[in-house]
A protein has these predicted regions:
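Active-site C-terminal subdomain of aminotransferase-like
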Residues: 136-139
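Rossmann-like NAD(P) dinucleotide-binding subdomain of oxidoreductase/dehydrogenase enzymes
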Residues: 1-134, 151-158
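Flexible, acidic loop-helix segments that line cofactor/substrate-binding pockets
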Residues: 64, 109-111, 119, 141-149, ...
Length: 177
C-alpha cells in the first residue's frame, strides 16, 4: 500500500516498539526491496538505542501462507495490517478463530468517497477538478487518503466537472514509488 509510511516502519511498528513489544513484519512482495532497506534502518536504530537483539524482524514471502501462520501463532498477541478488504478480513477471521483471539488493527480498502453538490461545483468546480486530479495521484496514488469515488447529482455542473477532471488526469505525469 504505502511502503515508506505504513508497511514496515509505520505507526503499528513504532507503537509496538515504543511499548516494548517485539515486531515481526511480513513485507508485501511488490515492495520487498523497500521493506528490506527500511528494515535495515530499524534494526540499526534498535541496536543503537539498546533494544534487545531480535526485537524487529522482516519476513519476505510472495504468498499469504507466512502471514497466515504468523496470525495463528500463539505467541503473536496482535496484528497490524494495511491493504485490501479481502486480505484484512481474512486475517481478522484467522485471529478470531484462535483459542485466544487477538486484536487486528487494519486499515483496508480506502475508497474515500467524496460528495460534491451542484452549488459547490458551480462555484469552484474547475479549480476543484484540478486539485482532485492531483490528489488522486498524490504519492503515486498510494496514499490511503487519496480520493477514490465521486458522488454527485446528475446535471450540467457534474458533467463539466467530469470533463475537466478527465482533462486534468490526462495531464498528469506517471510517477514512481
Amino acid at each position: 500500500n504505502f511502503p515508506l509510511a505504513f508497511s514496515t516502519a509505520g505507526g503499528d511498528t513504532a507503537s509496538a516498539l515504543a511499548a516494548g513489544c517485539p515486531v515481526i513484519v511480513k513485507s508485501h512482495p511488490m515492495h520487498s526491496g523497500t521493506g528490506e532497506l527500511v528494515s535495515s534502518a530499524i534494526i540499526k536504530a534498535a541496536k543503537k538505542t539498546g533494544m534487545p537483539n531480535g526485537v524487529f524482524s522482516n519476513l519476505n514471502s510472495s504468498g499469504i501462507a507466512v502471514g497466515q501462520q504468523l496470525v495463528k501463532h500463539p505467541k503473536v498477541k496482535a496484528v497490524g495490517f494495511t491493504g485490501s478488504i479481502h486480505g484484512g478480513t481474512a486475517l481478522y477471521k484467522l485471529a478470531n478463530e484462535r483459542d485466544e483471539p487477538i486484536p487486528v488493527f487494519a486499515e483496508m480498502g480506502s475508497i474515500n468517497p467524496v460528495v460534491i453538490l451542484p452549488s459547490a461545483l458551480e462555484a469552484v468546480g474547475a479549480t476543484w477538478a484540478t486539485k482532485y486530479a492531483s490528489s488522486i495521484n498524490l504519492g503515486a496514488g498510494q496514499f490511503c487518503t487519496n480520493p477514490g469515488l465521486v458522488l454527485g447529482i446528475k446535471g450540467d455542473q457534474l458533467d463539466a466537472f467530469s470533463k475537466t477532471l478527465s482533462q486534468e488526469i490526462l495531464k498528469l505525469e506517471p510517477t514512481f514509488m
